[in-house]
Amino acid sequence: MGRTLESKKQIVKKIEDLLDNSEMALVLDYKGLSTKEMSDLRSRLQQSDGVCKVTKNTLMRQAIKGKNSWTGLDSLLTGTNAFVLIKGDVGSAVKAVQAFQKETQKSETKGGLFEGKLLSQDEIKAIAKLPSKEALMGQIAGALNSITSKIAIGINEVPSGLARSLKQHSESGES
């Protein structure tokens, strides 16, 4: 028995809500994956604020209709698709998908969309090589800490230098 029109509308609404909260989408061919493997992928994605949604291409097409930033997905909507929607740490979510694909050897990334731009395989791999948000924040914090330390040392050096000069001058005046 097929789905009713009302249940299809609810599914489309849920997909629209997921898309509204997502920064990036990947389209995977999930043919040949077991339920256990799909559950494994979903649990890996939870850690990086991503979700894996399996839905009919026609329902996804309805969800992206009128959303300019997502219409690029339309060209990828053929075959058996799982949609990875990422709202948090894009780099670590892509890494999780790639690690999963490497382990299972069953799934393939058809493409992706980030900020309205259709991504090639190379661009998706490049995103995976980016450091995580936490690593970037650590690098920025380290750089800021370094700058403030150098400023503090520089400010402290002015009176110290003046004191050394005065001491040297007074010692040269005594002899």
Swiss-Prot record:
Q: Which GO terms describe its cellular component?
A: large ribosomal subunit
The alphabetized UniProt keywords are: Ribonucleoprotein, Ribosomal protein, RNA-binding, rRNA-binding
GO MF entry, a single one: large ribosomal subunit rRNA binding
Record bears the keyword Ribosomal protein: yes
Q: Report the record's Gene Ontology biological process terms.
A: translation
SUPFAM superfamilies in alphabetical order: Ribosomal protein L10-like (SSF160369)
Q: Which Pfam families match?
A: Ribosomal_L10
The record's Gene3D superfamilies line, in alphabetical order, gives:
3.30.70.1730, 6.10.250.290
Q: Which domain of life is it from?
A: Bacteria
InterPro entries under this entry?
A: Ribosomal_uL10, Ribosomal_uL10-like_sf, Ribosomal_uL10_bac, Ribosomal_uL10_bac_type, Ribosomal_uL10_CS_bac
Q: To which protein family does this belong?
A: Belongs to the universal ribosomal protein uL10 family.
What PANTHER family does this protein map onto? Answer: 39S RIBOSOMAL PROTEIN L10, MITOCHONDRIAL
**What functional role does this protein have?**
Forms part of the ribosomal stalk, playing a central role in the interaction of the ribosome with GTP-bound translation factors.
Q: How does it assemble?
A: Part of the ribosomal stalk of the 50S ribosomal subunit. The N-terminus interacts with L11 and the large rRNA to form the base of the stalk. The C-terminus forms an elongated spine to which L12 dimers bind in a sequential fashion forming a multimeric L10(L12)X complex.
Name the record gives this protein: Large ribosomal subunit protein uL10
* Organism expressing this protein natively: Prochlorococcus marinus (strain NATL1A)
Gene encoding it?
rplJ
